[in-house]
Amino acid sequence: GKTEVSQFKENETKVQSDYVLTYTNSFDNGNHNLTATAGFTTYYNSLSRLDGARKQGVGLVIPNDPDKWFVSIGDAATATNGSTQWERSTLSMLARVIYNYKGKYLFNGSFRRDGSSAFSYTGNEWQNFFSLGGGWLMSEEEFMKDIKWLDMLKIKASYGTLGNQNLDKAYPAEPLLSNAYSAVFGKPSIIYPGYQLAYLPNPNLRWEKVEAWEAGFETNLLRNRLHFEGVYYMKNTKDLLAEVPGISGTIPGIGNLGQIQNKGVEMAVTWRDQIGEWGYSVSANLTTIKNEVKSLVQEGYSIIAGDKQQSYTMAGYPIGYFYGYKVEGVYQSQADIDASPKNTLATVTPGDLKFADVDGNGEITPEDRTMIGNPTPKVTYGFSLGVNYKNWSLGIDMM
């Protein structure tokens, strides 16, 4: 029989500190209103983990001492171990100003400087980000006062930059060494342990940056019972942080691979009313999105994923688009097979799928694979219904 001993310990620490100073004031009889904020934040995250296992014959007594449970006694092939330890931290300095004139001309601006330990080994740990926004409450203008059914109309626009440092690697610029391999040299042959990088390091690794802007409006109508909002947005993700799959047995790498663009329209409408002690609301929303990879590391480069290479990412196409054979229909008869381009992939019979000859060479070959689908939905929408009576409420959401 076998005796087994296992031990698992994990200790994770997360500490966040925020130090913020805010100044608020109004000038010129309340015509000018200002709020200014400045400060800095820190974030620290660490993890320490210890694994262990032991199987050994009943005749070999395991000392009742945790420090000796994993000493290499007995059959070494049955002993396992493992350990994980890492820490990461960020420091951010920030400032923000919010201003309005007479409550109808609106402005806000922010700036932050972020530093991340993830890029400290490449010298790119610091990056600046900012945002600007403005709005015009048109319904407060004198020339809009006579429109009785219009309660509020606001035009708004904004532009900003954000950063991303998140990867599933604690030290993305410093890969771990794995000793899962060995080499044999000499006569007599001697086995030497070998070490391999978990992934190729990148000395130029840096922050992923997102540039986003949007413009739109929102309005309340019919005594604030009807609310409508519409926005056009565009988001460009640059210096995309991603892992490059290994090719032909090579190990993967990590880098800033390129640029991705998302753009579209967001719309939402809500009708809300009160009848006595009963209230109800009906809402709907719709979002369109066009996703496109604008560039990768170099022209013609592609990222292939999936056990059958069915997911492709390359410039000019949606990210992770489905790659395969386009189906034209089903072979109806042997005569249909004989009259169609020859399928060199397999022997086909009536009832099998008929693939398109994309390259037009008269044969169905692997070169006929093309984009056959987009994993990113072009349109998403949802509905919600709500009813309330006194202190009771019921809501239904559908997407």
Residue ranges, per PLM feature:
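Extracellular/periplasmic, surface-exposed regions of secreted and cell-surface proteins
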Residues: 1-315, 384, 390
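Active-site loop/lid in soluble adenylation, ligation, and acyl-transfer enzymes
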Residues: 20-22, 372, 378
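C-terminal beta-signal and adjacent terminal beta-strands/loops
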Residues: 148, 290-292, 320, 332, ...
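Solvent-exposed beta-strand/coil patches in large extracellular/periplasmic or lumenal scaffold regions
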Residues: 202, 354-357, 374
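Conserved C-terminal beta-signal and adjacent last beta-strands/turns
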Residues: 281, 374-399
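Glycine-centered loop/turn motifs
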Residues: 308-320, 343-356
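C-terminal segments of large proteins
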Residues: 325-326, 330-334
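Acidic carboxylate motifs that coordinate Ca2+ or other divalent cations, activating on Asp/Glu
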Residues: 361
